[in-house]
Curated annotation (Swiss-Prot):
The SMP-LTD domain is a barrel-like domain that can bind various types of glycerophospholipids in its interior and mediate their transfer between two adjacent bilayers. Residues 1-233 form the SMP-LTD domain. It comes from Zygosaccharomyces rouxii (strain ATCC 2623 / CBS 732 / NBRC 1130 / NCYC 568 / NRRL Y-229). This is Mitochondrial distribution and morphology protein 12. Residues 246-258 have a biased composition (Low complexity). InterPro entries: Mdm12 (IPR027532), MMM1_dom (IPR019411), SMP_LBD (IPR031468). Belongs to the MDM12 family. GO terms for cellular component: endoplasmic reticulum membrane; ERMES complex. Residues 238-258 are annotated as: Disordered. Its main location: mitochondrion. It is a peripheral membrane protein. GO terms for biological process: mitochondrial genome maintenance; mitochondrion-endoplasmic reticulum membrane tethering; phospholipid transport; protein insertion into mitochondrial outer membrane. One of its GO terms (molecular function) is lipid binding. It holds the Pfam family MMM1.
Length: 258
């Protein structure tokens, strides 16, 4: 069963895009960069106007592992509720998501940090086709990718995945899931925006490193047994407090009470 998403509401949500950008920057700060790259950060992030195609495959009770994972971080134990639910969905995305990054390329010869060059990277044409879990538990929304799904448009000769079968198995033993199957990276090195110096484009070594960073990020953060967790408890508490502090005004101009 397929269903539509009001993607325009997400795409136009500047707070959501900013939150995703901040999360990615936090991850970039935690990784070890090679000696020739420093100060890697995300300048801009946009979900794009193209929505993913989502197909519902199964509805069930949430896995026990999800409750155990939440209870490790929650002061109050979360127990199964009749309102808890889990969806197994197929997600296909070939859209116009756009990420702009900046970094400094370092030349360490004849001495350390002998020269640095500004680098700008633009990521676009992202493609993925995966099976994932979406679970709702006590005002928590959990999302975890399980495996990649065979896709004629994404399974090229350069794919890290074995195209035999409907669900792909990785050619490299440590890569059971790739999530991002297609991605375009454009690299510019030099003072293009200030109008000084020359600009180098398509620096393959740096582009390959960035590709591996994003694949590692997704595998560590959103592929099973890890997941994305969205907690709505704080938002509800803030809304409740605001409703208590702010009087409600009717159309006639009179103030109504509780």
């Amino acid at each position: 069963m397929s269903f539509d998403i009001h993607w325009s509401n997400l795409e136009s949500d500047t707070r959501l895009n900013e939150s995703i950008k901040n999360h990615l920057n936090t991850y970039l700060e935690s990784i070890s960069l090679p000696s020739y790259v420093c100060n890697l950060r995300i300048l801009d992030f946009s979900l794009g106007k193209t929505a993913p195609n989502i197909t519902l495959r199964e509805i069930s009770d949430p896995l026990d592992e999800l409750y155990r994972g939440l209870n490790e971080d929650e002061p109050d134990s979360i127990t199964p509720s009749p309102n808890d639910i889990q969806f197994l969905v197929e997600v296909e995305y070939k859209g116009d998501l756009l990420v702009t990054l900046a970094a400094d390329l370092v030349l360490n010869y004849p001495s350390d940090n002998f020269m640095t060059l500004p680098v700008k990277l633009t990521i676009s044409n992202v493609g993925l086709h995966s099976l994932c879990l979406v679970a709702h538990l006590s005002k928590h929304l959990l999302i975890s990718f399980l495996c990649d799904i065979s896709d004629v448009d994404l399974d090229g000769n350069e794919s890290l995945l074995d195209p035999k079968g409907h669900v792909l198995s990785p050619r490299r033993s440590l890569e059971r899931i790739s999530i991002i199957r297609n991605m375009k990276i454009e690299t510019e090195i030099g003072q293009q925006h200030s109008g000084e110096g020359s600009v180098l484009r398509s620096v393959g070594r740096l582009e390959q490193f960035l590709l591996e960073i994003f694949k590692d990020l997704l595998r560590k953060e959103v592929s099973w047994p890890s997941w994305i967790e969205l907690d709505f408890n704080d938002d509800n508490e803030e809304d409740l407090q605001q409703s208590k502090d702010t009087p409600t005004t009717a159309n006639t101009g009179t103030t109504t009470t509780n």
